[in-house]
Amino acid sequence: NAHLLAIAPNASSSIICGGTSPSIEPYRANVYTHKTLSGSYQVRNKYLEKLLKKKGLSMDTREKIWKDMAIANGSVQDIEVLSDEEKEVFKTATEINQIYIVEHAHMRQEYVCQSQSVNLFFTMPKATESQSVHDEYLQYVNDVHWYGMNKLKSLYYFRSDAARSAENVNVKIQRVKLEDVECLSCEG
């Protein structure tokens, strides 16, 4: 066996395996809507759900927290019942300093036979932000990529949230039946 360990891009595989984390990637959000051929449903971070239950919060309070998180794009940073340490644990992919993602990939690289599919996550500043904020963002993106270039064999995707996004006017989940346009065997 020439290769003993490879890390594939596993977003689809994580869904098939029942909502596990997407391999080496951090979660994009703690709550999000997953759309499939059979409809849409809300996916929640099961570890965060356990923590909220452990805190003894009522079902109504927990549901309000999930709704607030959905409005905040899956972020827990404004959830008052969580400690600062808990907020650190449940940061979304864009809230994590991307240098850490590169550093972790660098540390595990010697144990991986092939190159890793390392994705980086950024949130662009809003168009209304000052020029200095935009300059800092560009410098940060540049610094992370230079750091990655010197530490890793390659980087895979640059994922960014849009500078402008539609208002989240309704977080209610709507079931939509999608047309079966592709072979179901090819979905994985």
Give names to the regions the model predicted:
Residues 180-183:
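Residues immediately within or flanking Cys/His clusters that coordinate Zn2+
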